[in-house]
Amino acid sequence: MDMRQVNSLSYEEFVETFGNVVERCPVVAAAVWSGRPFANSHDLEASIGEFIDSLPVAGQEGIVRCHPDLAGRDLKRGALTAESRGEQTQAGLTLLDAGDAARMNRLNAQYKERFGFPFVICARMNNKEEILLRLAERLGNEPAQERQCAIEEVKKICQLRLQDIIQCPATHTKL
């Protein structure tokens, strides 16, 4: 899909197309639709980021809570969104051995107990070892710092999901 097509989508089509660029949060797509026309994918991405940043703390935490636990119950039940399943598969989280799975479950539980929302990281930019390391490290963050970190990871996920949907025009260079 190119930007001309993006900008011509009806409200319903836009929300259907972009409703999961922020995991299980179609309200984000619904909110930014009225900002059309977008000059390019970066403009759309910036609009989404600005909307998320403008939310009160409870709204930002709500967005983070829409994400599943990594390698968690939803993965085992087959209840992940297609995007999340692909991202977790790419990071190697669907093939954890028993030891790594137990460690992931333990750290996820500790994290959720400490912060009140699931650990979010852009799985496509990390592998299972890096994810386990970051999860353990981020347990030491202060709550406000960790909420901001989680929101920045949500934005990275959003950026990659937008790239999956929108064709970016090729860069033409003179040789």
Curated annotation (Swiss-Prot):
Family from the record: Belongs to the OHCU decarboxylase family.
Subcellular location: Peroxisome
Active-site residue list: H67 (proton donor)
Catalytic activity: 5-hydroxy-2-oxo-4-ureido-2,5-dihydro-1H-imidazole-5-carboxylate + H(+) = (S)-allantoin + CO2
Biological process according to GO: allantoin metabolic process; purine nucleobase metabolic process; urate catabolic process
MF annotations from Gene Ontology: 2-oxo-4-hydroxy-4-carboxy-5-ureidoimidazoline decarboxylase activity
Pathway: Purine metabolism; urate degradation; (S)-allantoin from urate: step 3/3
Keyword terms, alphabetized: Decarboxylase, Lyase, Peroxisome, Purine metabolism
Function: Catalyzes the stereoselective decarboxylation of 2-oxo-4-hydroxy-4-carboxy-5-ureidoimidazoline (OHCU) to (S)-allantoin.
A GO CC annotation given for this chain: peroxisome
Entry-linked Gene3D superfamilies: Oxo-4-hydroxy-4-carboxy-5-ureidoimidazoline decarboxylase
Record-given protein name: 2-oxo-4-hydroxy-4-carboxy-5-ureidoimidazoline decarboxylase
Main location: other
Cysteine pairs bridged by disulfides in the record: none
Gene: urad
Quaternary structure note: Homodimer.
InterPro entries in the cross-refs: OHCU_decarboxylase (IPR018020), OHCU_decarboxylase-1 (IPR017580), OHCU_decarboxylase_sf (IPR036778)
Residue interval(s) of motif Microbody targeting signal: 173-175
Source organism superkingdom: Eukaryota
Record: residues binding substrate: P68, S84, R85, G86, E87, Q88, F119, V120, I121, C122, A123
EC number: 4.1.1.97
